[in-house]
Swiss-Prot record:
Belongs to the conotoxin A superfamily. Residues 1-21 form the signal peptide. It comes from the Eukaryota. It is found in: Secreted. This is Alpha-conotoxin-like Bu1.1.
Length: 63
């Protein structure tokens, strides 16, 4: 492959990655805010007893 062909393939990969990144971001509402206290309380109520919300907790991970 020539340099021009390799550069074109590189640009196509970057473009495809960008399109995939933007399409998966549609699920969010665009805000980067922390969850409210009500949302945090509701999510912790739905967990079984003994579950750990901390990602570093390996012993009692649920979910």
């Amino acid at each position: 492959m020539g340099m021009r062909m390799m550069f074109t393939v590189f640009l196509l990969i970057v473009l495809a990655t960008t399109v995939v990144s933007f399409s998966t971001d549609d699920e969010s509402d665009g805000s980067n805010e922390e969850p409210s206290a009500d949302q945090t309380a509701r999510s912790s109520m739905n967990r079984a007893p003994g579950c750990c919300n901390n990602p570093a907790c390996v012993k009692h991970r649920c979910g």
